[in-house]
């Protein structure tokens, strides 16, 4: 992948980043810049898979930053993994306190609460000057939404409304929030583009994520809140969610149980490694949609939506084969493991779709970035983490 060249310029007292996104054609991209230096960032879902990796990345990239994390730590999956993630964050933050280059007295603050708790959310905003909000808190899982709808209404709708209201009353420079590739529903056209219609969700989870995009657009229009929605595609990696296929399959294979491969293996997923997701989030967080007025003098909503995916869907059977090979390589499974005896091909489950495939052209054009971690490399890192974590 080519290296981009960035230059900071100032026009009419506004700071911009100018990027040559390709040294061969010298195409220019100009986007607003938000400096995170000396600022406070709120990350919701901070004990979650993406949230915890984002917090660690922010501390790695910006020495003088305060990050406030909020998470309800539900038992939707093993809470020990969530506490382990928080422990890693706390260790990094403790190191920053003793770093002479860090002027923040307390760079990390964790709030154990749900974003559906309006008072808890308001308290965070009242007591802190929040610059950027990254809303990653949500009840995840397509299949779980079929049997447990209440959890999705509370976290994904009421919780997101509370975040929007807080951003409305306490001016923030940028609201970035997690949407999902599931909003594309049963769309037949691939790759999925953010220009496609997404009016026919096939699960309640997808419906709540589409609702988030609509709510954010309304608040951007009414209250001029710069917001960016991110449609994530099948995120995986070390210390991930045990309910995801790669993690769940591994747990079952280790126990000698049979794994169910849906749609008889005729599924394709745009598996996206967590570090690539975080890279996209970090770039987008610092570049808010510009506030401007239209020809009628009324504000144009400072609102954007991007896909973050690998732009390379993998067949589920190929995915399982690579996972098995890497689990053997890492010593999680023995060399003579009988994989065929532990596979069962079953029909498609309600709420699932046969293919996910991200068109990442806007992400590449606006930020010069495209996820590029191969599935084998990503699953190798997961397998190595799994071997270490469960050995201990």
Question: What is the predicted function of each stretch?
Answer:
Residues 2-9, 14, 20-29, 34, ...:
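C-terminal substrate-binding subdomain of Rossmann-fold SDR/epimerase-dehydratase oxidoreductases
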Residues 132, 214, 244-248, 318, ...:
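Generic alpha-helical secondary structure signal
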Residues 201-208, 232, 238, 242-246, ...:
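The catalytic Tyr-centered alpha-helix of NAD(P)H-dependent dehydrogenases
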